[in-house]
Amino acid sequence: MVNARSRSPASAGRRWGARVLLGALLAFPLAANPPLATPDRRHVKNAWEIRNEITVPPSSEMEVKDYFLSFRDYQELVLYDSKAGYYSSGRVNFVQDYFTFPNTLAPLFEQMVAVQVFKMWDGMRRAGTLGPRDRFTIAEFGGGNGEMARSILGFLNEAQQKDSSGAWLELWQQVLYVSYDRSPAMVAEQRVRNSPAGGKFEVREGDATNPASLIAAGSIKGVILSNEMLDNFCVHKVVLSLDGSAEVAFVAPTLPPALWSRLEKRAPESLRRLIESDDRIIRDRFFHDEPAGARWLSRASFVALLEWLASLPDYPSLVNSILFHEIYVPARAIPELADHLRRYARPYACELAKLGRDVVTYISLDEGKFMEGIGRILKAGYVLTIDYGSNWEGILAPAPYSHLRSYGPGHRRSDPYRDAGLNDITTDVNFSVVAAEGRSVGLNTAFYGRQRELQAGTPIKLNELPPDQLVDAHARQYNTWLEYFKGSQAFKLLVQQKENTDAAYAYPDLHRVPLDVDEAGLRPPVRNRAAEIEKKLSAAVALASR
């Protein structure tokens, strides 16, 4: 029997199919599937984030990855699939779906960034790290609609025309703004929006999780910039427990009988055969005691179905009729995740011990890949990261809301399975991991704190909106967003400096936030519990390398 816990609600070149593998696996003898008890999740602090959990026999847990998408792969699909993905399909709307500060506080938000960039350039120049003939590159990853680039370049151009000292002119002569985005639709929009900048702006299509594949090693002197980009990295959904176990979520979609009856009459024959075939394979492997009716979707059949549905006018109603289940298996099923948990077992254990409860958390492995790539391409300069997130304590402490959110036209929710392919899905950034991964590749933390500290050391007066924007539609809400900018605890600023930059510049030493776990502040019982959890967690995930 399938046990449901509750009733609550890619990169383009990726090959999702696994037909041959499914058939090969089916050749092995099948074990009986007795009715399974529903996992006891009462000790999970934020158990409401677990959606329609079902179980498989322990002997089959390691096979789940061969049939179903991990939660991370599901997120990758619905955001970036070339036909069904929210970003790649061009459905994204930066005004209706959500607001970002480069839009709501434009152009003053970008002007603060521009002044910080000027100070970094000036510090490198005075220290001799940047020569007068060197190019100074502003490389933005996840440029979205290109508003950040447009406003920054506009400010730099205006400043060099007004400045009598000649410094801004020197920067303008050296600067090149290069934007990278994985969405072809966003690349096209940026190119049009920034066409007035001429040769000062370039936009290129590329995946930010692998910067070293886009840019030659050691070729950049300047600033690596991102605003609300890391939060879009796809994440593994993980349950961390006080007993030291770690479980990762896989997504098992099903077509209820009524929905399959509708789709069967309309779907292409090849898709019908794929769904029927993989449903039989999945039932035989995991759920052969289940009554027939609903159709189980494998990784391959779900992707094929979603891409076909995306072409239909009634896509929203159809995709919302799919029932999504989650299957949790030991995290060692994904070796890269197991390696991450092993390397960061200590801080995870400390925060679990402080909480005294199991917890659902979201882990991005791409944060580390991004920082590794940035460390390789940046010869000298800075990394300026603006995003919402927290340190170890904040990222594991369950808030009244989920650390994962979904944004679409006129709404925000925490259900990633609603309106699949029609919404953005974002997750709070673990800045402690970003900083640690940066240090490992020569990027030292110069500042970490609240986003409002971006204004530090700049002459920008946020209370003085430019006269030409007083009649703009967003200007009427400007003060509301300004107060949010000043008071928000969620948005953070991380400034990192590449080693050997030796710039005559330091970020203002203001209200810094700690990045590491304060182990000295732990009470002895909590410290002992943390040591025990760390030992068990390290042992559990170490099995992945055997």
For each feature predicted by the language model, list its residue ranges.
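N-terminal mitochondrial targeting presequence
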Residues: 1-43
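A mobile, often basic/glycine-rich helix-loop segment
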Residues: 223-340, 400-407
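Long, Lys/Arg- and hydrophobic-enriched amphipathic alpha-helices
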Residues: 313-546
